[in-house]
Amino acid sequence: MKGVNHYKKYKIQPVEFAQANELNYCESNIIKYAVRHKDKNGIDDVKKIIHYAELLLELEYSDK
């Protein structure tokens, strides 16, 4: 699979990992931003991880 430079150093692309493990949208975005934050957008990507984690909490656990 083709990949952009900030993912090429990994054995598997985040999208391939997400697909193989049937991750939902929030989970796959958390993985994507966690993998790339050091090579691309730094703190902005970490903030996106937090955003998607909070969204995951709301969607999956708000009634518990």
Role assignments for model-derived ranges:
Residues 1-64:
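Intrinsically disordered, low-complexity regulatory regions
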